[in-house]
Amino acid sequence: MCPLWLLAALLALSQALPFEQKAFWDFTLDDGLPMLNDEEASGAETTSGIPDLDSLPPTYSAMCPFGCHCHLRVVQCSDLGLKAVPKEISPDTTLLDLQNNDISELRKDDFKGLQHLYALVLVNNKISKIHEKAFSPLRKLQKLYISKNHLVEIPPNLPSSLVELRIHDNRIRKVPKGVFSGLRNMNCIEMGGNPLENSGFEPGAFDGLKLNYLRISEAKLTGIPKDLPETLNELHLDHNKIQAIELEDLLRYSKLYRLGLGHNQIRMIENGSLSFLPTLRELHLDNNKLSRVPAGLPDLKLLQVVYLHTNNITKVGVNDFCPVGFGVKRAYYNGISLFNNPVPYWEVQPATFRCVTDRLAIQFGNYKK
């Protein structure tokens, strides 16, 4: 457990670069998931970082739940075997950490009076029931981490101020239309590790959202879901059962710059599919069943990283990665992985990688027979 003085000190340093875990927020996640900068929030008026503590009322230092650690406006009640949300939480609390307990239900008045709460951590409890008004008092809540619980549905009536929702590793099978209604500031949703199938997403389930980041990994998807927010910059669908990428699958995601499709069963990527991703910088297709390098990579002028290791690729053509000729303007690759494929790497022509910054950026080897 982090010392409380360290938690408080790191609170001020939590404005990390986009999609990188930094300092304070590391303690809330144990699965290496990337963290979003508050400046990525789609509603500029919502925040530019951690709330201004000086603008809040004086701290109620005498109020601290039994067994918890309270300092500044951080209340840490993790790893205490709690069965319910504790009482006597200071009304000026901005971060409440309740992870690693035995809480099974969130009741109507559990968070009453916590109108300044910015982040709520409920990871790794036994929550299966949430009152429809449980989050009503949390008018300034921006980060809700409720992963690794027993939820079978996305909680109703989430605060309209919410920017980031981590709800992975639950038992959710359905995302109904309207469940995210009114969440115009939502920027990041992590919902992997749920038994979601393609049929579990109702048409219009993501209507109104302007997400930057979405992860639905380790689910039961057999294809790229339709009608995801077209504002996405990052989409991670790794560890699913996707078998093919068809022409129309990526049509609406022209703003993507990172696409994760590793650890699926992809055998075919239809020609022209990748042409809808003009801003793509990073493509993960490792651990699939591809027999050739996908067509269209040379036309992605911003693409810099391609993971193709652990597939069934038998041949790499001289124009598979780079445009024909040397005068075509494009970003240089700084990472291409092709190891663990049945391609004789000694037969690949050196000119194949003429648009790579450094030969060390090319990962061959581990020849797979």
Curated annotation (Swiss-Prot):
Post-translational modification summary for this protein: The two attached glycosaminoglycan chains can be either chondroitin sulfate or dermatan sulfate.
Glycosylation sites: 42, 48, 271, 312
Source organism superkingdom: Eukaryota
Propeptide: 17-37
InterPro entries: Leu-rich_rpt, Leu-rich_rpt_typical-subtyp, LRR_dom_sf, LRRNT, SLRP, SLRP_I_decor/aspor/byglycan
Keyword Secreted found: yes
PROSITE patterns: LRR (PS51450)
Gene3D superfamilies, A to Z: Ribonuclease Inhibitor
Tissue: Found in several connective tissues, especially in articular cartilages.
Residue ranges of LRR repeats: 83-103, 104-127, 128-151, 152-172, 173-196, 197-221, 222-242, 243-266, 267-290, 291-313, 314-343, 344-369
Family matches, as Pfam families: LRR_8, LRRNT
GO cellular component terms, A-Z: extracellular space
Localisation: Secreted, Extracellular space, Extracellular matrix
Position of the signal peptide: 1-16
Disulfide bonds: 64-70, 68-77, 322-355
Record keywords, A-Z: Disulfide bond, Extracellular matrix, Glycoprotein, Leucine-rich repeat, Proteoglycan, Repeat, Secreted, Signal
Chief location of this protein within or outside the cell: secreted
Biological function: May be involved in collagen fiber assembly.
Self-association and partners: Homodimer. Forms a ternary complex with MFAP2 and ELN.
Family, per entry: Belongs to the small leucine-rich proteoglycan (SLRP) family. SLRP class I subfamily.
Name of protein: Biglycan
